[in-house]
Amino acid sequence: MVINSFISSISKEEKKGSVEFQVFCFTDKIRKLTSHLELHKKDFLSQRGMRKILGKRQRMLAYLSNKNKVRYKKLIGQLNIREPKTR
C-alpha cells in the first residue's frame, strides 16, 4: 500500500511535529471516520469530529502552501487528496 511506504519514509525523514506528518495523521483519521460513517449514517458526533479534523487539515495545507509550494504539491500528490477550492 502506498500509504504504508509513505509513513515509513516520512517518519524517518521528518519529525512528528512537521506539517507533513500532521496532515498525514489527519488524512488517516479522516479515512477511518469515512469508512465508519458509511456504516453508521446517523452518528452525528463522528460527523462533527470529522468536520473539525477536515478544518484542521485545511488550515495546515493552507499554511504549507503559503510557506513552501513544492512540499505542498508533493504532499497532495502522495496522499491523493484534492486541492481546496479557492475563493
From Swiss-Prot:
Does the keyword Plastid belong to this entry? yes
Q: Which InterPro entries match?
A: Ribosomal_uS15, Ribosomal_uS15_bac-type, uS15_NS1_RNA-bd_sf
The highest taxon in the source lineage is: Eukaryota
* The family this protein is said to belong to: Belongs to the universal ribosomal protein uS15 family.
Protein keywords: Chloroplast, Plastid, Ribonucleoprotein, Ribosomal protein
Gene Ontology cellular component terms for the protein in this record: chloroplast; ribonucleoprotein complex; ribosome
What gene codes for this chain? Answer: rps15
Q: What is this protein called?
A: Small ribosomal subunit protein uS15c
Keyword hit for ATP-binding: no
Q: Provide a Gene Ontology MF annotation, just one.
A: structural constituent of ribosome
